[in-house]
């Protein structure tokens, strides 16, 4: 079955899948079920000395609480198909529960990182329900015979010491800029407060500099040519906002002094005049500012965190 799929992909893309680099093995899990683990190596256009491999973990021993959602496979390149391929995925609330359970089991840096990224968006943008989220988590943990993770239990675990020492080693090479662990530890406490039903303050939305189109919704990815013919680096802005990191924004206003501003990123809005606007708090001026996206020349994500005073919508 796997080799048939590899042959079809190879015919459509030209990517080679050497048969000797395809390997699957069955392994028992702690509950007496079977997990199928495998790797599929491939040779693409870059021709690295060591061929990369795709890793698979397949199991029937898992409880699915929410109905899967059909989502398009993200493809940011120019050769993306007109009709993107779609696959069934966990909804966000179930992914968050999976990550929280994993945090209790192994406590790896990527688990903490994903919990905070998902919970920030889940609470503030997607409006996830805390009681429903806790119910999903309880059922996930019960399936594996695990206690519900708590902040105290996580910090008392030997895994936490390893997480602290491996934060930079395991995440630094995967991210444009590495957020400080302290900010994620602080937000983990907020997440568990929310999960327990405690009230968590909701920050106000930014004050707009000009009226925006209320019907506009930001796309999954933003690509926009600037007035100078180069792509405005808007995904860097999104990354900084989602990770609560300051930006060095190289901006060329229609009037005023061009140059680099240190900015807290908050939101994209689409003005009634037809401009995509980035709203950020200018640190030097201590005020929210609307920046036209097509006038942004460059973005550098710093490792300096900020504590939002408005709702981050990125």
Where are these regions (language model features)?
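Structured mid-to-C-terminal alpha-helical surface segments
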Residues: 1-226, 312
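Core beta-strand-centered patch of the WYL/Sm-like small regulatory domain
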Residues: 49-83, 215-314
């Amino acid at each position: 079955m796997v080799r048939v799929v590899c042959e079809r992909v190879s015919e459509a893309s030209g990517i080679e899948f050497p048969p000797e680099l395809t390997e699957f093995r069955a392994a028992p899990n702690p509950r007496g079920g079977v997990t199928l683990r495998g790797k599929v190596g491939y040779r693409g256009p870059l021709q690295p000395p060591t061929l990369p491999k795709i890793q698979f973990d397949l199991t029937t021993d898992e409880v699915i609480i929410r109905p899967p959602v059909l989502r398009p496979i993200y493809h940011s390149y120019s050769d993306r198909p007109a009709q993107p391929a779609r696959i069934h995925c966990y909804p966000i609330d179930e992914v968050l529960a999976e990550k929280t359970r994993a945090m209790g089991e192994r406590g790896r840096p990527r688990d903490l990182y994903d919990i905070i990224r998902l919970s920030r968006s889940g609470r503030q943008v997607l409006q996830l329900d805390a009681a429903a989220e806790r119910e999903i988590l309880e059922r996930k943990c019960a399936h594996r015979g695990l206690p519900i993770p708590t902040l105290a239990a996580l910090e008392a675990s030997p895994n936490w010491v390893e997480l602290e020492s491996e934060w930079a080693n395991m995440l630094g090479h995967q991210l444009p800029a590495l957020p400080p662990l302290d900010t994620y530890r602080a937000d983990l406490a907020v997440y568990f407060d929310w999960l327990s039903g405690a009230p968590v303050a909701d920050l106000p939305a930014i004050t707009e500099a000009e009226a925006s189109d209320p019907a506009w919704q930001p796309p999954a990815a933003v690509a926009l040519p600037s007035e100078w013919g180069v792509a405005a680096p808007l995904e860097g802005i999104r990354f900084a906002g989602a990770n609560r990191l300051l930006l060095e924004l190289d901006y060329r206003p229609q009037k005023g002094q061009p140059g680099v501003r240190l900015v807290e990123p908050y939101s994209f809005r689409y003005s009634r005049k037809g401009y995509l606007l980035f709203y950020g708090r200018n640190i030097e001026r201590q005020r929210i500012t609307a920046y036209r996206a097509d006038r942004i020349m460059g973005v550098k994500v710093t490792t300096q965190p900020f504590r939002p005073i408005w709702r981050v919508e990125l």
